[in-house]
Amino acid sequence: MRWANFLHIYQPFGQQPDILAAVVEQSYRPLIKNLLSHENAKITLNINGSLLDLFDQYGYHDLIEGLAEAGRLGRVEFTGSAKYHALLPFLPKDEVMRQIESNNETNRKYLGESYNPKGIFLPEMAYDPKLAPWLEEAGFEWMIIDEIAFGGQVDAIDYNKRYKVKGTNLGVYFRERRVSNLIMSAVVRHAEQLKVAIAEDLASSRYVVTGMDGETFGHHRPGLENLLFEVFEQPDLELVRISDLADFYPEVVECEPVASTWASSPQDIASGIQFISWDDPHNDIHKLQWKLRDFTLAAFRKMDKKHADFPALRGKLDSALASDQFFWACARPWWSIEMIEEGAYYLLDILQHLPAIDPYDFETGQAYYHQIVAMAFSWKRDGKIYEIQQANNNAMRIPFKERTLEAGGAEPAVYQAFIDMMTNQEQEASKRRDYEAAVMWRDAVYKIENKTDMYEAVHAVDLLRTTLPNDEVEATIARYKDEYRRIRGGQPEQRGIADPS
């Protein structure tokens, strides 16, 4: 098995310096230090240009130098991206290309010759078919997107083959959810545990592409950075960069990826709401945010490019196209009034400084801004945020035992299948003397049996699904139940309503 691990690191361009300092010490600095100290380390990395600007602004020049050195040593392959983490499916072609080229310029400025991207990471792995020819035109050989993009289902990729988008020469590498979520969920915290969990893969000739936020290691998951550093030391793990895979897997298959993100579920895609965290058709704040974004973009396009203020306002617009404000307004469960207001203000500020803007146009934009802020405060004050989050969690608020064993019909078979699989995981962990994992599975069974499982951030059923290969889970369930179907998203902390199993 060859393992291509992709990491994405990013902070909003206006990130508070104290938050940035925490992430630097907890995640970025340890990561770069260990990339430089382990000769066998190999990763593919995206760092948005906006984060490199922050490193420079706040004096983290050692991080910039360390990344450049890791690139020179061949331990890091850098990808392209959108400089300000814009959601590319929602932009016209010229803005997409500008975000990409601005990111290239910034990365080259700081990283020098180490930055020579063959591939591109789309923020949130947000893909739309219209992007493929544009990315090829931008000079990229491949992109990394989630496996859900392959027909809207998971576990359909043959990782002994490579893929390219039909009608183009743009290669596609699909992020595998099971192994990615196994790590992100901290189900495994040591290299030996990981090797046990992927033993079948290790013995094969296939490749694995994992993908996650770099902040997972140390910041989101304190202590999990040690797993990554242990992986760098394992002689029996063949680590490669994504571009290296072409040297080992010559067969290429055409495919037609569907619109998706790395958080989309099959249900999201079937329902046409694959971008729900940023564009929820039932979220009135989202609707206003997009109206203000589109209005500002249209107003800016009327500006004379020869005007002295054009470059400064163009730069402001680039950064204002970031996806953050939409994400923090989704309330499933992510919510921040500060981020909502800040994103709207950046757009209003552009309108305010457009020369010769029609007063009526400015008043229209200002009205959008006030509506967004007022609605955000109203949702918080009136409890709507709580209602949305509660509705989002309704399925998980019902104990698994009630949804299965006590539901009658064929559902008790589902309950027993999962209890038996978890019990088996406990026993296997005990045999390996992995008592931490054994206790985790023992406690999971106890909570399910006593109906206290609905309070877990990551449910035991989801943990089991990241621990065992999907075909093994399905085969086990098939022995207990004639028909079984699951609907779940691509990230371990779910923001969508989950199926009972």
Where are these regions (language model features)?
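Acidic carboxylate-rich catalytic motifs and surrounding loops in phosphoryl-/glycosyl-chemistry enzymes
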Residues: 49, 82-85, 122-123, 240-248, ...
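Short phosphate-engaging motifs
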Residues: 127, 216, 437
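Active-site and substrate-binding clefts of carbohydrate-active enzymes
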Residues: 2-29, 33-38, 159-161, 168-170, ...
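C-terminal-biased regions
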Residues: 376-501
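Catalytic alpha-helical scaffold of carbohydrate-active enzymes acting on polysaccharides/glycoconjugates
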Residues: 1-118, 125-174, 181, 188-204, ...
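Composition- and surface-driven signal marking solvent-exposed, interaction-prone regions
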Residues: 186-188, 221-226, 329-334, 441-443, ...
